[in-house]
Design a protein with these regions (language model features):
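Terminal-region recognition feature
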Residues: 1-118, 124, 129-130
Length: 133
Protein backbone atom coordinates (compact mmCIF):
# COMPACT_ATOMS: atom_id res chain seq x y z
CA UNK A 1 0.00 0.00 0.00
CA UNK A 2 1.31 3.43 -0.89
CA UNK A 3 2.40 5.55 2.06
CA UNK A 4 0.50 8.42 0.44
CA UNK A 5 -2.71 6.50 1.10
CA UNK A 6 -1.70 6.16 4.75
CA UNK A 7 -0.79 9.82 5.29
CA UNK A 8 -3.20 11.31 7.85
CA UNK A 9 -3.37 14.69 6.11
CA UNK A 10 -4.22 12.95 2.82
CA UNK A 11 -7.00 11.05 4.58
CA UNK A 12 -8.32 14.25 6.16
CA UNK A 13 -8.17 16.05 2.81
CA UNK A 14 -10.18 13.26 1.12
CA UNK A 15 -12.89 13.54 3.76
CA UNK A 16 -13.34 17.32 3.73
CA UNK A 17 -14.87 19.62 1.13
CA UNK A 18 -12.35 20.71 -1.50
CA UNK A 19 -9.51 19.28 0.61
CA UNK A 20 -9.59 22.62 2.42
CA UNK A 21 -8.64 22.40 6.10
CA UNK A 22 -6.65 24.11 8.83
CA UNK A 23 -4.42 22.16 11.19
CA UNK A 24 -5.26 22.66 14.86
CA UNK A 25 -1.64 22.17 15.88
CA UNK A 26 1.62 22.12 13.93
CA UNK A 27 2.38 18.65 12.58
CA UNK A 28 5.05 16.72 14.48
CA UNK A 29 6.28 13.13 14.54
CA UNK A 30 3.78 12.24 17.30
CA UNK A 31 1.71 10.14 14.90
CA UNK A 32 -1.50 12.16 15.16
CA UNK A 33 -2.86 15.11 13.15
CA UNK A 34 -5.96 17.22 13.86
CA UNK A 35 -7.70 19.77 11.67
CA UNK A 36 -10.88 21.75 11.18
CA UNK A 37 -12.74 21.89 7.91
CA UNK A 38 -16.09 21.51 6.22
CA UNK A 39 -18.16 18.53 5.09
CA UNK A 40 -21.03 19.56 2.81
CA UNK A 41 -20.57 23.07 4.17
CA UNK A 42 -20.78 22.03 7.83
CA UNK A 43 -17.84 22.64 10.16
CA UNK A 44 -16.19 19.56 11.69
CA UNK A 45 -13.06 18.71 13.63
CA UNK A 46 -11.10 15.70 12.40
CA UNK A 47 -8.14 13.83 13.85
CA UNK A 48 -6.21 11.02 12.18
CA UNK A 49 -3.53 8.61 13.30
CA UNK A 50 -0.41 8.11 11.19
CA UNK A 51 0.30 4.39 10.72
CA UNK A 52 3.66 5.20 9.11
CA UNK A 53 5.00 6.41 12.48
CA UNK A 54 5.47 3.52 14.90
CA UNK A 55 2.48 1.71 13.43
CA UNK A 56 0.15 4.52 14.48
CA UNK A 57 0.78 3.78 18.16
CA UNK A 58 -0.56 6.56 20.33
CA UNK A 59 1.73 8.19 22.87
CA UNK A 60 1.53 11.16 25.20
CA UNK A 61 1.86 13.88 22.55
CA UNK A 62 -0.53 12.18 20.12
CA UNK A 63 -3.10 11.78 22.88
CA UNK A 64 -2.92 15.50 23.54
CA UNK A 65 -3.67 16.16 19.86
CA UNK A 66 -6.89 14.16 20.22
CA UNK A 67 -7.81 15.94 23.46
CA UNK A 68 -7.27 19.30 21.73
CA UNK A 69 -9.47 18.14 18.85
CA UNK A 70 -12.25 17.30 21.30
CA UNK A 71 -11.87 20.65 23.06
CA UNK A 72 -12.10 22.47 19.73
CA UNK A 73 -15.18 20.48 18.70
CA UNK A 74 -16.87 21.02 22.06
CA UNK A 75 -16.09 24.73 21.98
CA UNK A 76 -17.56 25.12 18.50
CA UNK A 77 -20.36 22.59 19.14
CA UNK A 78 -19.50 20.66 15.99
CA UNK A 79 -18.96 16.95 15.26
CA UNK A 80 -15.59 15.34 15.88
CA UNK A 81 -14.40 12.61 13.53
CA UNK A 82 -11.57 10.23 14.36
CA UNK A 83 -9.72 8.39 11.60
CA UNK A 84 -8.08 5.40 13.27
CA UNK A 85 -5.27 3.15 12.02
CA UNK A 86 -3.38 2.52 15.23
CA UNK A 87 -1.31 -0.09 16.96
CA UNK A 88 -2.67 0.97 20.36
CA UNK A 89 -0.59 2.61 23.08
CA UNK A 90 2.97 3.69 22.30
CA UNK A 91 4.66 1.43 24.82
CA UNK A 92 7.98 3.22 24.41
CA UNK A 93 6.35 6.14 26.29
CA UNK A 94 5.89 3.80 29.24
CA UNK A 95 3.00 3.84 31.68
CA UNK A 96 2.45 7.53 30.90
CA UNK A 97 1.04 6.55 27.49
CA UNK A 98 -1.70 4.59 29.25
CA UNK A 99 -2.56 7.64 31.36
CA UNK A 100 -2.64 9.71 28.17
CA UNK A 101 -5.18 7.26 26.72
CA UNK A 102 -7.22 7.84 29.87
CA UNK A 103 -7.29 11.56 29.06
CA UNK A 104 -8.57 10.74 25.56
CA UNK A 105 -11.32 8.55 27.01
CA UNK A 106 -12.26 11.34 29.44
CA UNK A 107 -12.60 13.78 26.53
CA UNK A 108 -14.81 11.26 24.70
CA UNK A 109 -17.03 10.74 27.75
CA UNK A 110 -17.32 14.50 28.33
CA UNK A 111 -18.41 14.97 24.70
CA UNK A 112 -20.90 12.09 24.83
CA UNK A 113 -24.45 13.34 24.30
CA UNK A 114 -23.19 16.86 23.58
CA UNK A 115 -21.65 16.61 20.12
CA UNK A 116 -21.66 13.89 17.47
CA UNK A 117 -18.63 11.59 17.63
CA UNK A 118 -17.78 9.53 14.57
CA UNK A 119 -14.99 6.99 14.18
CA UNK A 120 -13.61 5.69 10.90
CA UNK A 121 -11.43 2.61 11.25
CA UNK A 122 -9.25 2.44 8.15
CA UNK A 123 -6.81 -0.24 9.16
CA UNK A 124 -5.75 -2.41 12.06
CA UNK A 125 -6.68 -0.73 15.32
CA UNK A 126 -5.64 -2.30 18.60
CA UNK A 127 -5.83 -1.46 22.27
CA UNK A 128 -7.13 1.97 23.20
CA UNK A 129 -7.74 2.97 19.60
CA UNK A 130 -10.33 0.21 19.35
CA UNK A 131 -12.33 1.61 22.27
CA UNK A 132 -13.26 4.96 20.71
CA UNK A 133 -16.87 5.86 20.05
Amino acid sequence: MSTTLLDPEARIAKLLDSANYELLLPRTDCGMVAATGLIKGNKVVVFASDPTIKGGALGIEGSQVIVQAYRAAMGAQVPVIGIWHSGGARLSDGVASLNAFGEVFQAMVTASGRIPQISLVLGPTAGGGAYGP
